[in-house]
Swiss-Prot record:
InterPro entries: Cyt_c_oxase-like_su1_sf, Cyt_C_Oxase_1. The lineage of its organism: Bacteria, Pseudomonadati, Pseudomonadota, Alphaproteobacteria, Rickettsiales. To A.aeolicus AQ_155. Keywords: Cell membrane, Membrane, Transmembrane, Transmembrane helix. This is Uncharacterized protein RP382. One of its GO terms (cellular component) is plasma membrane. The chain crosses the membrane at residues 17-37, 56-76, 111-131, 148-168, 180-200, 223-243, 261-281, 300-320, 355-375, 382-402, 434-454, 472-492. It comes from Rickettsia prowazekii (strain Madrid E). Coiled coil: none annotated. It is a multi-pass membrane protein. GO terms for biological process: aerobic respiration.
């Protein structure tokens, strides 16, 4: 039964991971348009400037919202014990009723595999939605295209993920809330459900207001997604902490000494996220204090948990004893010298650790850079997206680490000569190069955005007047963006080729 559960979980997790990779790839294609239109020398290639905002909206939704939530859904499916029997502790006295409940539970597990397919269809609707019209609404967190195709796609994705979360929660093992995995799964599911509570609360409040006074569509969507969008950022942070600690545990090859501390951080971030509900309780949605509450909430509480996590990780590494280092060295030497089966290629563990170290370094660097830039925000200009790009791409690279960690064990299995050509593309050096390229490009892109914002270039407007002094910075931003796109698409290519096309690597449902 346990192996069957594990097969269920791995297959389900990979389905969501595939969706995340697809959405990231599609978002990367749209980002090419954004970079070209933001680069003075290249913007003349696009005569219709409305394409910029449409591309921006689709890019944000595909490469942030759907990508990060797909990784979150993958974590739910991969790490949760999906029980194929009735709930523990429920007494069912009648045999027929017991059979019905058992059959229903099996059926629920089968239904879980429908959700990634529905989400994939929703993602395609979002990707092609610009064909239905360019009526753009550039509100924060979940920017909108006001056409039926986009709204259907976004609604389908949200409802699908909500139903999936409720199903996972139904099958959740409530007796094991003392480990990192289950706390992450439980807390992020509750946070995601609460984000829908916020969306519903905001919608109800706005419906009452528009009956009295008209509201501009951009202001409407800004308020509709403001509270729930803030809560989504805390979900991303929760997943970030989980992945950072998981990657650290992989490279240290031992149980972490500060396990309880990391659990405390996850619970702390969870409690901070729940405080978001007080914005709706304390303020009217039309009141300016409503938006300020969430801005201050993010400003003062959003970075506490990840910073504490980084402190714990640094102390963990510093306090690693010489004995542990010696054991680690012996372990790596033993894996390096182990025999390789005939006609097979095996990726050694020490190289896997090298990739994970690279991912951790790049993720932490970009996340901290985004935090430092946030200190300099004092106007509505390009400093704001510079901060957000740093933080969110730092989280995104951590999610890439989760993806690589999922794929690499498959590559460690026996891979025969017939697939050797694929391994050239999937080699460790290419993986590390993709991550470094993405990070370097993003640093250039972020710094170009930040300094352009300091010189007064406004956000969300490709036609804003660009001072001569910031032309070079905008060019740096464009070049950095293109470099980052290449790195990101390399990631999509490597992971996509492994998960979709490499024979012998599929996890079949048993």
């Amino acid at each position: 039964m346990h192996s069957t559960n594990k097969s269920h979980n791995n297959s389900l997790a990979n389905a969501w991971l595939k969706l995340g990779i697809i959405s990231l790839g599609l978002g990367g294609l749209y980002s090419i348009i954004l970079v070209v239109l933001r680069t003075p020398q290249l913007s003349s290639f696009f005569l219709n400037q409305r394409i910029f905002k449409s591309a921006l909206i689709i890019h944000v939704n595909l490469s942030i919202l759907i990508w990060l939530l797909s990784i979150t859904a993958s974590v739910w499916g991969n790490e949760t014990s999906l029980r194929l029997v009735k709930r523990r502790g429920i007494f069912i006295p009648f045999g027929l009723l017991r059979e019905i409940v058992t059959f229903y539970t099996f059926d629920r597990n089968d239904v879980l595999y429908i959700y990634p397919k529905l989400a994939f269809f929703a993602t395609l609707l979002i990707a092609i939605s610009p064909l239905a019209g360019y009526n753009t609404v550039t509100n924060n967190y979940i920017p909108m295209l006001a056409n039926i195709v986009f709204i259907l796609g976004l609604s389908l994705f949200g409802v699908t993920l909500l139903l999936y979360a409720i199903n996972i929660l139904y099958l959740f093992d409530w007796m094991k809330l003392n480990n990192l995995v289950n706390v992450t799964v439980f807390s992020t599911i509750i946070m995601f459900i609460l984000s829908f509570v916020c969306f519903g609360w905001s919608y109800k409040s706005l419906q009452k207001i528009i009956q009295i006074i008209p509201i501009e569509i951009e202001f409407y969507y800004e308020l509709l997604f403001w509270s729930g969008g803030h809560l989504l950022q805390f979900i991303y942070t929760q997943i970030l902490i989980f992945i950072w600690v998981s990657l650290l545990r992989t490279i240290t090859v031992r149980e972490l000494k500060f396990q309880t501390f990391y659990l405390f951080i996850l619970y702390l971030n969870f409690v901070f996220s729940i405080l978001i509900l007080f914005g709706h309780i304390s303020y009217d949605i039309i009141d300016i204090a409503f938006k300020e509450f969430y801005t201050d909430h993010m400003k003062y509480l959003g970075g506490i948990a990840p910073i504490l996590c980084l402190v714990g990780m640094v102390v963990e590494l510093v306090l690693m004893s010489y004995r542990d280092k010696l054991v680690l060295l012996i372990y790596r030497l033993s894996t390096k010298s182990s025999k390789i089966k005939k006609d097979c290629i095996t990726l050694s563990n020490h190289r896997t650790h090298s990739i994970i170290k690279t991912i951790l370094l790049c993720s932490i660097t970009l996340f901290l850079l985004g935090g430092l830039i946030a200190i300099n925000i004092n106007d509505i200009n390009l400093v704001i997206p510079a901060h957000y790009h740093g933080s969110i791409v730092g989280i995104s690279i951590a999610c890439m680490g989760y993806s690589y960690q999922t794929i690499i064990p498959l590559m460690d299995h026996d891979i025969h000569k017939t697939t050797k050509q694929y391994l050239i593309t999937l080699s460790i050096n290419w993986i590390k190069f993709a991550i470094y390229l993405l990070t370097f490009g993003q640093i250039l892109h972020i710094l170009g955005l930040a300094f352009s914002g300091i010189y007064g270039v406004m956000r969300k407007d490709p036609n804003s007047i660009v001072p001569m002094s910031s032309k070079l910075l905008m060019g740096m931003m464009g070049i950095g963006g293109l470099i980052a796109i290449v790195g990101g698409l390399m990631f999509v290519y490597i992971c996509g080729k492994t998960m979709f096309f490499l024979k012998g690597m599929k996890l079949e449902y048993e």
